[in-house]
């Protein structure tokens, strides 16, 4: 028995009946020989971790276009926070951590430069609307490895595509990443805005702080624990109605108080000048020579 087969056996014996087992993967578009050591989702995680698009995340801003200081989030730090949150939930629910991690590490590969402002500009340039989740899938399927793609499993691509659509991922692991993404960006956008003195902790509505917590750490703890306690032993990933509604309201506060202030006026103004000029130049160049 190979090391991979031993790991797959342990998955069958220890993971939840609702987990996505490596041996039950729908496979890859181009069939490959199995690795002697790593199951399929672990191989996918490694491919994403070592691809060029993943390394480029470090220079893509999350919210602030030109942050002064090293402590503001980038797409890379956001991705790592999503992965950490998702793995914590998956481990507690005995779901497949390798699948969760692969989806989390790949979910934002298709995001634009210049944060949300860059996406705003590119959305106006494209013949069809630009969606970063679709671009993420395009990267792993067609652009990486000189056009060969990473040949990821169906489950990982499904989780990447549906982490931000009306459709839900087909696996519980994908649903975990979908919620973990929201948990991460809602909280760290507010944390960065407080650091940038755009708002203070006291600006957050009191009722939301009473429900979710009076600090970023407390809110993360509340949301993650709520998902675990409400999803354990079930074939879905859910939250309590009270906490879910509070998270929705906190997201609205985040958009209104953080995104619109940090990249709304300033971001769109820059999108009409420097950032727009850069995106226009790159778009025109690649459109002329695909």
Language-model features, listed with the residues they occupy:
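Histidine-centered, transition-metal-coordinating active-site segments
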Residues: 1-79, 83-89, 96-97, 130-290
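Short glycine-enriched loops at secondary-structure junctions
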Residues: 54, 106-109
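A short acidic, glycine/proline-enriched capping/turn motif at secondary-structure boundaries
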Residues: 87-89, 108-111
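Post-HEXXH active-site segment of zinc metalloproteases
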Residues: 98, 102, 115-130, 196-197
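Short alpha-helix carrying the canonical HExxH Zn2+-binding catalytic motif
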Residues: 101-106, 179
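Alpha-helical ligand/cofactor-binding cores
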Residues: 105, 119, 137
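Short active-site segment of divalent metal-dependent hydrolases/proteases
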Residues: 110-114, 184
């Amino acid at each position: 028995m190979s090391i991979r087969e031993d790991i797959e056996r342990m998955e069958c014996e220890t993971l939840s009946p609702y987990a996505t087992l490596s041996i039950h993967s729908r496979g890859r578009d181009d069939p490959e020989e199995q690795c002697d050591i790593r199951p399929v989702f672990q191989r996918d995680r490694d491919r994403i971790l070592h691809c060029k698009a993943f390394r480029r995340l470090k220079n893509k801003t999350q919210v602030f276009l030109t942050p002064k200081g090293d402590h503001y989030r980038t797409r890379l730090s956001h991705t790592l926070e999503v992965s950490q949150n998702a793995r914590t939930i998956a481990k507690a629910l005995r779901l497949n951590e390798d699948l969760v991690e692969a989806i989390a590490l790949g979910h934002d590969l298709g995001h634009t430069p210049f944060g949300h402002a860059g996406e705003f500009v590119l959305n106006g340039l494209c013949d069809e609307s630009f969606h970063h989740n679709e671009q993420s899938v395009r990267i792993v399927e067609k652009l990486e490895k000189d056009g060969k793609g990473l040949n990821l499993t169906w489950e990982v691509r499904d989780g990447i595509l549906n982490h931000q659509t009306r459709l839900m991922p087909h696996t519980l692991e994908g649903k975990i990443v979908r919620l973990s993404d929201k948990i991460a960006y809602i909280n760290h956008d507010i944390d960065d805005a407080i650091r940038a003195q755009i708002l203070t902790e006291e600006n957050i509505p009191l009722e939301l702080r009473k429900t979710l917590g009076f600090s970023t750490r407390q809110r993360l703890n509340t949301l993650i624990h709520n998902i675990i306690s409400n999803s354990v032993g079930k074939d879905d990933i859910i939250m309590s109605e009270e906490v879910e509604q509070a998270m929705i309201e906190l997201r609205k506060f985040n958009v209104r108080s953080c995104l619109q202030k940090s990249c709304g006026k300033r971001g769109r103004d820059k999108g009409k000048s420097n950032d727009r000029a850069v995106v226009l130049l790159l778009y025109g160049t690649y459109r002329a020579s695909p």
